[in-house]
Amino acid sequence: MMFDITKQFSLVGKVALVTGAAYGIGYAIAKAYADAGAKIAFNCRSQAHMDKALADYKKDGIEAHGYICDVTDEEAVRAMAADIEQKLGTIDILVNNAGIIKRIPMLEMTTEDFRKVIDIDLTAAFIVSKAVLPGMLRKGHGKIINVCSMLSEVGRETVAAYTAAKGGLKMLTKNIASEYGDRNIQCNGIGPGYIATPQTAPLRTPGHPFHEFLLSKTPAHRWGTPEDLMGPAVFLASDASDFVNGHILYVDGGILAYLGRNPKG
């Protein structure tokens, strides 16, 4: 019997929930899953974002099911997961993508600011995973993909809460893989580098010191795009990654591998 590698990457018949998928990275991942054959559900927090997202999905030929849901609200998340299961079937693929960043020097950051980032970027992934895992366990298979960051590995000024949250998300990923791997659950992470999204717009102005710094530190010598994450996300959601567990796949243009150019040549 011939082995068809293309079938390993198919998501036909799968149900995927992508949090924070109204635009940017989440939207690109949801679109990739739809292109690979999955049924798509997503959430966002405002009606304005929902209306635009549904119009964008429709324009791209995708029938997406949208929910206005605060992913830090356990009751709302459980209700969303139950509704998805009733309408689309058991959730096979969960992408914990919802997140925020606050760029504030640590000594100027309030505890409230710190907690808000932790709640949305880390605690929400725990809440949504906890709501979705029982269905995956009943079905005997599931994929959880946590959108981590290159800042899961390294620090940088003004983003103490974000690095703490993303470092924690990396370890939550490994723990879920360790705890449920024997029940055919694969939990992995994607660690984007600096991606051209609305969150990074203030840093991407040509001539901005950080823009020039980033290009000098990235072997690919460019900002990433949401589309750069589509292939890796499909891989981690597909049967092709069934023996990959607890791994963080960094999609960063090589920045974590690069110490910098020797000024002496």
Pin down the residues of each PLM region.
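Conserved glycine-rich cofactor-binding loop
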Residues: 15, 22-24
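Conserved glycine-rich Rossmann-like NAD(P)H-binding loop of the short-chain dehydrogenase/reductase
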Residues: 38-52
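Short, small/polar-rich loop/turn modules that mediate ligand/substrate recognition or access, typified
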Residues: 95, 181, 186, 244-246
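Substrate-binding pocket helix/loop in short-chain dehydrogenase/reductase
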Residues: 105-106, 113-118, 214
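Active-site helix of classical SDR
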Residues: 129, 165, 173
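Alpha-helical segment proximal to the catalytic Tyr-Lys
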Residues: 134, 178-182, 242
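Residue(s) in the substrate-gating loop at a strand-loop-helix junction
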Residues: 149
